[in-house]
Amino acid sequence: MGDRVEALAIFRKKQGVLSIDSRLKWTGEGKTTPSVDIAFDAISNLQTTPASNPKVMIRVFIVVKEGEDPTSLVFHFTGTPNARENCDMITNELRNAIQRQREGSQSKPQGANVDRVNSTNLEKDIDLQESLLTNNPDLLQTFKEAVMKGHLSNEQFWSTRLHLLRAHAVERSQQRGPYNVLSTIKPKTVDNQMKVSLTGQQIHDMFEQHPLLRKVYDKHVPPLAEGEFWSRFFLSKLCKKLRGDRITPMDPSDDIMDKYLKDNEEVTKVSDEPIASHLFDLEGNDQNANVIAELRPDITMRIDKEALPFMKNINQLSERLLEKSLGNSKRFNNENEETYLKESGFHDLEEEASDSKVVLKIKGQDQLLENNFVPSKNQVGLEPLPSLEALQHLYQEDSISLNHIEHDSDSLAEAAMQLTQSMREKHEFETHGTASNLPIDIKNEIVLCHTVTIEFLHQFWNALLNTTFPDKKAMAPLQNALLNSKKRVEAIASQAQEQNVDPKLVYELVSCTLTSIDTSISEYQRRMSYPPA
């Protein structure tokens, strides 16, 4: 926000000062607290009189509550010194402040709104619902049958799927972080020729993650064709180095790519870490002592010179990916500096802080401890609790052993047979229809009818159990939807009969669903037969 701007203005026939800093304020003459204090995001419109009008005033429209008409506040500058100049100054500064406020609110990431989504916003977010239906074909089919055919309203359908909408909103707000693109590209050999498929985004990411590759590309393309360059690169030792793979003597040589094997890919930059003093630079002192004394580490502790370049390359790539994800924030540098200062201090030489505890002294403490404890009258006649040995002796005879349990082999065999038969029937229905070779189109119709009917039953019982006495207007469409489901089952049975399939098979598969429909309608009619209390 800019500097504070203020000017004399009249509000409701009272003289005062109109000021703009972080908010729009008007303070009456002789008062310290502002009578008008308005946030910039509450201002919906701004009007001012033209220069030809002798009256100089500003009309500010503010929104007190969402959905209500804006309220106007009028500030007059007529009769004050430099009225027109002050009016223009206040108007321009107020417009700039409102513009900055709106730009700041729009620049916030969309992911921050995910935590604030509630049930009402989810049910009204049509774009989110369309995205979820596009990604879930089964849910889309159910939506078409239940909502688009007029059986359920859009709010009823989504009221039972708020968890799906909320999870999808969180999924959409997440952004994919950077990854090692080069390791995901796998060239293929077709007709003794290597083929590689690259997109523009992949090439851009590789150049951003590997500055050395961008340097080689800019230097040799042209004269090399782009296809030839990428074919030679993916077969070269340079590609294996950037990937972090070990280079072997069997790898083919390339007179262009091999010249860059010893080049360091790390970009030179100014280090944010302070230079360590020789007084407590343990790593530097250790290296210096080894050089002077000509000491070499044990063979198990020596660095593998062949693996060292690959380790450095992978570490540098990981560092670049992290910097891109974190935005190279200075906050981490400040944390590292504070940690460095804490670790470099000689804390063992600091004076110990004195304990500021309060010592509690009791007069006559010895006399209190020497007095014999005399039980009260209520405690004299009580018997002590039995000992643990006495309790164990009481329950020693009736001990329980979990190793000897009576098994009903017939019941176990029957349960296992029923479970196996159920799993076999489910597998046969999902793969081949039924044992009687039910056509696949009939099977799909049955599955869809069952799914939609379950949705109707869910909504039906939610509305029925929501109140003590059901609402006829709300229950009538749901009852009709259940009755239409029974008619649809009859239509599927007729369709099966036309294809020389026994209709009894269809009724057997949906028998539980039909029973649920009859039970629901009977319960609704039973409740409607009782008058409301």
Curated annotation (Swiss-Prot):
Instruction: Report the leader peptide range.
Output: none
List where Polar residues composition bias occurs: 106-119
Pfam families, sorted = BSD, PH_TFIIH
**Which InterPro entries does its entry note?**
BSD_dom, BSD_dom_sf, PH-like_dom_sf, Tfb1/GTF2H1, TFIIH_BTF_p62_N
UniProt-annotated location(s): Nucleus
Do you know which Gene3D superfamilies this protein is assigned to?
A: 6.10.140.1200, Pleckstrin-homology domain (PH domain)/Phosphotyrosine-binding domain (PTB)
Q: Report the family membership.
A: Belongs to the TFB1 family.
Biological role stated in the UniProt entry: Component of the general transcription and DNA repair factor IIH (TFIIH) core complex, which is involved in general and transcription-coupled nucleotide excision repair (NER) of damaged DNA and, when complexed to TFIIK, in RNA transcription by RNA polymerase II. In NER, TFIIH acts by opening DNA around the lesion to allow the excision of the damaged oligonucleotide and its replacement by a new DNA fragment. In transcription, TFIIH has an essential role in transcription initiation.
Q: Provide the protein name.
A: General transcription and DNA repair factor IIH subunit tfb1
Give the lineage.
Eukaryota, Fungi, Dikarya, Ascomycota, Taphrinomycotina
